[in-house]
């Protein structure tokens, strides 16, 4: 018997030892699923499974990092470094870079995060002179994302008469045209958004059987965490890869499926045994996290679910306090009720405000809670997913790196062509974009011609545009000659960003300079902190100087949960129920538990 199982309970131990057939591990909340997953992988390696043949897919990069660290503690001889581990997006980004040519992309393609995608959509909507109240970039992006998660491409969407009819009925008849133009521009910009990474992975495996066979043979053992929150695109990737060897292990809990609004399909976990008839089911039913009263309350609610995997979740912890149900007639009354109770709890627990959380279904519900907490002098913070990388100065500097790596990235070019100010106005930028559209080339290709008579429309701005293109070309030549952090400082300096803040001293400028310095420090440490890129088998990649492309991938593939930084401030935490997944607090208030709000009535994006 392996020492990896010494601290496991019987159910956990069984799930670890039986790894050579399809497995469904039903892991209730607080049941130690991470310990089981890491112990299972360590045991597989101990039994002779080559770590390079193991693919472990997680929900967040943070989860992947924590799992890898635990496995390295269990298998300290260095073999764990060869496991392919990360989110679906990070793993298949890595594969798509190798296969980009087959799909019509260059290997240095850019990844558009949500902000980049919404910026591009905003440009398209404005160019089409559409009402931004009817065509909000965020809503349009959400619907595009939902379509892609179900493997519906822009072309397929436009050809679907029911989709088009629904859009007309909902007074957004231009949606399919926006979708088509968005897809066209992403391709022209040599860019993929998050959802494209899954779409193109499926296209690769569908259209290129040799590629599918190659990765089937590489990934003989597949493990998927949080399987209840996978969408159709992710489901199909797993099905395709696991078809030959069938050594697939999925871990999840149908009772914790909370991302259907993002395209997650609870059917994926419910039909696993139909997909893999030889599958063995392991149930982790002991909750180590919660008191028995909380477990009982959760069980009584879950029992009402129409479709579920039968299980009996229990706790051997103390009974604990009973769940209290409090009534209020208005949201203001509810907010002050919570604020008063939170203030009392904070005083009684010695001022540990960060052990108190207020959960709600929608972000809009936080306003009343914030007002009440402020009036009661209770310190709080909003856990929103907004991050260091959302700050203007950071987005500006990152856009320079994006353009240097991928000159076809029009969105990056638009952001920095006059940042800091270099006398290139909005009219000139619009002319560049118009010429690019007319010639079916990127904006960068237009700029490269401004030094001659090729672009007469831009003759008056030719000198300024040539200076800008010269700067980018020069920096591009230097990126392979310097260590990453030194190159970062070079870009921040020669771009004029650092100088622009130093020339206008203010608290805001000082803060911006501190943030830029922090970003440069993160680049310096990146070699030791490669938390996204898995190690290539035996090629020494881990010891090589990291590239700008690798660093950009690291920050581009962060999920909202990964971006939410550690906050040492001692404050009550306000967050949506979705953000709270996997977190622990001593005291939790759930507000707005009322009809059509929690649970939310079905809405259409």
Model-identified regions with their sequence ranges:
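Short glycine-/polar-rich loops that comprise or flank the Walker A/P-loop
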Residues: 21, 49-53, 80-81, 244-247, ...
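Conserved helicase C-terminal RecA-like lobe
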Residues: 168, 352, 366-378, 391, ...
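Conserved phosphate/pyrophosphate-binding and hydrolysis machinery centered on Walker-type P-loop NTPases
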Residues: 9, 57, 85, 110-114, ...
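Short alpha-helix plus adjacent loop in nuclease-associated cores
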Residues: 91-99, 255-262, 289-290, 383-405, ...
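P-loop NTPase Walker
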Residues: 1-112, 118, 189, 212-213, ...
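ATP-hydrolysis module of ASCE/P-loop NTPase motor domains
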Residues: 19, 80-82, 101-196, 219, ...
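Conserved helicase NTPase motor core
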Residues: 6-17, 21-25, 36, 55, ...
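Helicase P-loop NTPase motor core
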Residues: 29-37, 51, 100, 277-280, ...
């Amino acid at each position: 018997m392996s020492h990896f199982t010494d601290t496991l309970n019987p159910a956990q131990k069984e799930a670890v030892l039986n790894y050579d057939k399809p497995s469904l591990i039903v892991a209730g909340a607080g049941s130690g699923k991470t310990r089981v997953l890491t112990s299972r992988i360590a045991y597989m390696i101990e039994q002779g499974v080559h770590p390079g043949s193991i693919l472990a897919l997680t929900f967040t990069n943070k989860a992947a990092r924590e799992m890898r660290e635990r496995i390295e503690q269990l298998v300290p001889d260095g073999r764990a470094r060869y496991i392919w581990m990360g989110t679906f997006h990070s793993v298949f980004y890595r594969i798509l870079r190798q296969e980009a040519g087959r799909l019509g992309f260059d290997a240095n393609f850019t990844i558009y995060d949500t902000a980049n995608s919404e910026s591009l959509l905003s440009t398209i909507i404005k160019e089409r002179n559409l009402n931004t109240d009817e065509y909000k970039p965020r809503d349009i992006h959400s619907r595009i994302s939902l379509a892609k998660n179900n493997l519906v491409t822009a072309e397929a969407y436009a050809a679907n008469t029911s989709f088009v009819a629904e859009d007309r009925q909902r007074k957004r008849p231009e949606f399919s045209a926006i979708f088509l133009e968005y897809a066209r521009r992403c391709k022209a910009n040599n860019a993929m958004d998050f959802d494209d990474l899954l779409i193109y992975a499926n296209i690769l495996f569908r259209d290129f059987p040799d590629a599918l066979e190659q990765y089937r043979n590489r990934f003989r053992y597949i493990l998927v965490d949080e399987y209840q929150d996978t969408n159709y695109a992710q489901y199909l990737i797993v099905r395709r890869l696991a078809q030959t060897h069938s050594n697939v292990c999925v871990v999840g809990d149908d009772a914790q499926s909370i991302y259907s609004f993002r395209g997650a399909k609870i059917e994926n976990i419910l039909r696993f045994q139909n997909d893999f008839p030889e599958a063995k089911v392991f149930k982790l039913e002991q909750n180590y996290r919660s008191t028995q009263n909380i477990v009982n309350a959760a069980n009584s609610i879950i029992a009402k679910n129409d479709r579920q995997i039968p299980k009996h979740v229990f706790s051997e912890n103390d009974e604990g306090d009973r769940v209290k149900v409090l009534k209020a007639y208005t949201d203001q009354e509810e907010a002050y009720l919570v604020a008063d109770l939170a203030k009392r709890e904070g005083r009684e627990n010695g001022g540990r405000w960060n052990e108190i959380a207020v959960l709600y279904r929608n972000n809009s519900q936080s306003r009343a809670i914030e007002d009440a907490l402020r009036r009661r002098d209770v310190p709080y913070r909003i856990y929103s997913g907004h991050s260091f990388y959302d700050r203007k100065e950071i987005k500006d500097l990152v856009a320079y790196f994006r353009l240097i790596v991928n000159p076809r990235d029009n969105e990056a070019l638009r952001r920095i062509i006059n940042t800091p100010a270099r006398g290139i106005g909005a009219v000139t930028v619009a002319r560049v974009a118009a010429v690019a559209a007319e010639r079916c080339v990127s904006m960068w290709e237009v700029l490269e011609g401004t030094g001659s008579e090729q672009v007469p429309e831009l003759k008056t701005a030719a000198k300024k545009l040539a200076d800008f293109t010269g700067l980018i070309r020069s920096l591009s030549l230097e990126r392979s000659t310097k260590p990453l952090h030194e190159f970062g400082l070079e870009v921040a300096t020669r771009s004029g960003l650092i100088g622009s803040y130093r020339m206008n001293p203010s608290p805001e400028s000082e803060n911006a300079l501190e943030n830029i310095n922090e970003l440069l420090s993160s680049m310096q440490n990146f070699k030791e902190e490669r938390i996204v890129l898995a190690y290539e088998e035996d090629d020494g990649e881990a010891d090589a100087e990291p590239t700008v492309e690798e660093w950009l991938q690291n920050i581009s593939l962060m999920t909202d949960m990964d971006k939410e930084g550690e906050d040492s401030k001692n404050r009550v935490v306000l967050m949506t129920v979705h953000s709270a997944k996997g977190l622990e607090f001593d005291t939790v208030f759930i507000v707005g538990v009322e009809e059509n709000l929690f649970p939310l009535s079905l809405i259409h994006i």
